[in-house]
């Protein structure tokens, strides 16, 4: 009786044999000396998107004006080739004397693009200084300093009022607030900064520092790293330093350092060389390479 299942017919055995030894691509696989399996090298980028933020200005002396934010410049499709300079601006120091103005922040540079450092806040006897954004007016009642950089990179600082209410530093997105007296001396808030999504995440930069006063206020720094009263601007935002309460220690509201960010398609090669004086990170995400320079100066080659 036949049994279902099993194999019918001769066994099918593999007949392919492989020679031992070293294998190589045959002449038939090469056309005019070019392998049919080429390795493609990435080419250098020809344009980049950039964000360049300068260092924020320092706050003025006791109850002094808030520091102005560092200049804010950004654009897309900037043509680039060869070598260029990158510099990340430092924040300006807060005044160490009652009457002194805060120091101006340092410029940040990318190739031919220069963002201007933020203006220093005014002190008891010294007017604020101009910058990417202007410093806040003195507690003696001076006007806030203007934003003089060209192209426009920020806004003016707020005006001071009487002896104990200084103006807030200007921000990239708004002027600094004025000092006021609604039943007590109040320093002006720092001007708001401006948001950028160049890294793939929205981050606000270049807020102005808060104006100082006689001790009754809770003035705040502008969004984007501006220092609250008696507080330094945030590192790598270009935020202005916050003016202190009248009886607080001097020199506490330094400006925040700036930042330089470059972005291009990840189908292009990495930057060839980056000067040893620069501190940076490289991230690749969403189809882009993003170089973030956070300190120093040096030459970069595409």
Positions of the model-derived regions?
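Low-complexity repetitive segments in secreted/extracellular proteins
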Residues: 2, 40-41
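Low-complexity, glycine/proline-biased repetitive segments and flexible coils/loops
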Residues: 2-23, 46-302
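Extended Gly/Ser/Thr-rich low-complexity repeat segments
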Residues: 27-29, 41, 300-302
